[in-house]
Amino acid sequence: MKLWGGRFTKETNQLVHNFNASLSFDQKFYEEDIEGSIAHVTMLAEQGILTNEDKEAIIGGLQSIRDDIRDGKLVFTEEHEDIHSFVEAHLIERIGDAGKRLHTGRSRNDQVALDMKLYTRKEIKEMEHLLFGLLQSLLKIMKENIDTIMPGFTHLQKAQPITLAHHMGAYFEMFYRDRSRLQDIHKRMNYCPLGSGALAGTTYPLNRERTAELLGFTGPTLNSMDSVYHNNR
């Protein structure tokens, strides 16, 4: 599925297609892309923009695509430019015209921003979990070695006697700060960009608060331009 070039009379040069394509790396967003689309069409149906029949067909199609990718039954191919066109093309192939209404009230810009936020949020949670386990291990070592003496170094030279608990405690503090930074990032980025459109929103009567709620965000982003531009920073 081509996302642009409707005015062109010839096929895009293969080199240009390859240069623009991002499926080789954004395919890792397939779960987030589908999760966001399910929330989006749920909101559209609640707002009366889509029929419930279309909503159910789209959600069923998206879930089957997700399951087939997980099971290795659906393979990513170079004919699609990115994960969004890949999912949408297969959805239309499976459920027909209803699949063409998936993208109602949405732009690739706010869709990409959403996918990146959902993926980043998932990875932050995983890193937090791993850091918590590391902190627990360090704490255990510290408790077991309160009286274990070792040399403390400065300029690669033995300088003062310290305990192993004190030495490991330094790393505990460092990793604790790292975990706090991740928590801060999560707090600041946990706002939903859907509804921002290409840069200035949409005329469809979307319920951005509802979409944000369905996806577990604190709320919707406040400025549509910031929502879609900040990925370039």
Residue locations for each model-derived region?
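A helix-coil-helix interface module used to build multimeric assemblies
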Residues: M1-G201, P205-L214, T218-G219
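Acidic, glycine-rich loop-and-beta core segments that form the ion-binding/anion-interacting portion
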Residues: L215-R233
